[in-house]
């Protein structure tokens, strides 16, 4: 008997275009990722916006992948320096803990783009500090960091055998 599987692509509400106040809610280590420039160690920074999705009543989550590099041409460095409002010092370039970004407010520019298959995406184009006098926002209590979510495996079935997923 066949077991059918099909594409169940779900449509999500896009984060609105424009400049929005946001708070960093997560930094996810992706490990080595195949890119057009070869295998690169990447991270994903995730932000929640200060607006609510009208349909779900949740704050939109946007994300951007970065190669884990502070090279002067690296998008991560460009965005971090803009976000911090200053250049890295030589000492800071020796090592910067990206985990310190969690909980930090900023403003992000969202731009909508179309992919090759015609889907629309909300992309983080730029990151800048919050303006003077702006009230800081906090991550919503419903967001759970990726590293804190239940990991698959580690469970046993009724016979005491390890479940591999």
What is each model feature region?
Residues 1-165:
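Short beta-rich binding modules
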């Amino acid at each position: 008997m066949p077991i059918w599987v099909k594409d169940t692509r779900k449509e999500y509400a896009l984060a609105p275009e424009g400049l929005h106040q946001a708070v960093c809610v997560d930094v996810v280590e992706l490990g080595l990722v195949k890119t057009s420039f070869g295998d690169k160690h990447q991270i994903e920074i995730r932000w929640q916006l200060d607006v609510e999705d009208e349909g779900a009543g949740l704050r939109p989550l946007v994300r951007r992948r970065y190669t884990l590099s502070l090279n002067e041409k690296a998008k991560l460095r460009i965005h971090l320096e803009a976000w911090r409002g200053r250049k890295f010092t030589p000492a800071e370039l020796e090592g910067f803990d990206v985990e310190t970004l969690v909980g930090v407010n900023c403003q992000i520019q969202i731009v909508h783009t179309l992919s090759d298959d015609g889907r629309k995406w909300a992309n983080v184009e730029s990151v800048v500090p919050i303006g003077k006098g702006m009230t800081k926002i906090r991550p919503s209590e419903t967001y759970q960091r990726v590293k804190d979510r239940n990991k698959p495996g580690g469970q046993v079935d009724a016979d005491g055998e390890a479940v591999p997923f």
